[in-house]
């Protein structure tokens, strides 16, 4: 082989090449067509083997059909997972957040309970059917009391009474037995209430009482109501519950209805006017004279209750003396 053949290589001086170069135009065209078919087949194989992720991210893969890219099965699975995540994120709303852990969700729900809603203040207009006056109430309906807050104000606390006893029961009963309106009989199952108004010239109320043979229940209460008369009156009821109902009905009739009041209050609101000076307890008034006094807390009526509702068999003879001092 000559030096020229060795330099140009065996492919240049092969018989097929020499035939192509020495042959006609038809032989050269056949060789070119066979090379083009081989290139198209190679392009098709490289397209099937390359991954979708590489073809989408690498622009050189589309411009270089002669560069095959091999992708392992694990890489193909990873690519599919990434595509699924991307599709889910695109379908999610712009302002929507990902699901939070269970613990954090519970904390946020607890914090939401303490966020007070902001809303405008409610306004209520009440027109009187009698006077035509219009009252405008601007307040929160959840906390406003349309039944009259002025009647539900707690009365002032009562000062404790001063109580004592003395043993001269016979002398006491003998003296009061001769006086008028100082002796009465409390029948079995009854409650007697002696109503004693405050006196303009007095500063405290005093009481003394005793009974024959058996004890009796006794308690003192105060009714914060205007005094129209200083006369002492006696009220008798079958039981303590019946007496309270009668007092409530009487107060509902006597008390004027304020303008703009949409409804009457319940009995509990009316009972808020009463202050307890001394609760009802059974007293050994058949052994010792029970006595006591209480300073006036203001204008009102004292209610001295003699309770025999617990006795089903015996009547109680009561001797009492009630007066005021200055």
Curated annotation (Swiss-Prot):
GOLD domain location: 160-324
Residue numbers of N6-acetyllysine PTMs: 170
One family name in Pfam for this protein: GOLD_2
The keyword Membrane appears for this protein: no
Disordered as annotated region, ranges: 1-99, 234-268
Compositionally biased region (Low complexity): 50-65
Sequence ranges of Acidic residues compositional bias: 239-255
Recorded superkingdom: Eukaryota
PROSITE patterns named among the record's database cross-references: GOLD
Keywords: Acetylation
Coiled-coil region(s): none
Keyword Ribosomal protein assigned: no
InterPro entries the UniProt entry points to: GOLD_dom, GOLD_dom_sf, Golgi-PI4KB_interaction
Name used for this protein in its record: Protein TMED8
UniProt source species: Mus musculus
Gene for this chain: Tmed8
């Amino acid at each position: 082989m000559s030096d020229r053949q060795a330099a140009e290589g065996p492919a240049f001086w092969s018989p097929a090449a020499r035939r192509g170069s020495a042959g006609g135009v038809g032989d050269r065209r056949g060789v070119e067509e066979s090379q083009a078919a081989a290139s198209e087949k190679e392009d098709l194989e490289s397209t099937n083997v390359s991954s979708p992720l590489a073809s989408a991210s690498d622009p050189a893969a589309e411009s270089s059909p002669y560069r095959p890219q091999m992708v392992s099965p694990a890489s193909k699975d990873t690519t599919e997972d990434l595509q699924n995540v991307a599709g889910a994120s695109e379908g999610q709303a712009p302002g929507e957040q990902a699901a939070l852990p269970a613990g954090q969700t519970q904390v946020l729900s607890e914090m939401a309970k303490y966020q007070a809603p902001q809303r405008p203040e409610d306004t209520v207009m009440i027109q009187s059917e009698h006077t035509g006056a219009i009252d405008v109430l601007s307040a929160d309906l959840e906390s406003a009391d349309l039944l009259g807050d002025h009647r539900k104000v707690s009365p002032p606390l009562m000062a404790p009474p001063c109580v004592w006893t003395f043993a001269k029961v016979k002398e006491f009963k003998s003296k009061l037995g001769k006086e008028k309106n100082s002796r009465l009989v409390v029948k079995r199952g009854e409650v007697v209430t002696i109503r004693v108004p405050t006196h303009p010239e007095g500063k405290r109320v005093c009481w003394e009482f005793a009974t024959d043979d058996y004890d009796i229940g006794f308690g003192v209460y105060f009714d914060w109501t205007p005094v129209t008369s200083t006369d002492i009156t006696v009220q008798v009821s079958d039981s303590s519950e019946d007496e309270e109902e009668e007092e409530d009905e009487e107060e509902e009739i006597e008390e004027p209805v304020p303008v703009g009041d949409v409804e009457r209050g319940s009995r509990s609101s009316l009972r808020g006017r009463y202050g307890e000076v001394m609760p009802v307890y059974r007293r050994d008034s058949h052994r010792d004279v029970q006595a006591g006094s209480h300073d006036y807390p203001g204008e009102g009526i004292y209610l001295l209750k003699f309770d025999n509702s617990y006795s089903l068999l015996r009547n109680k003879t009561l001797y009492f003396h009630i007066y005021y001092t200055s």
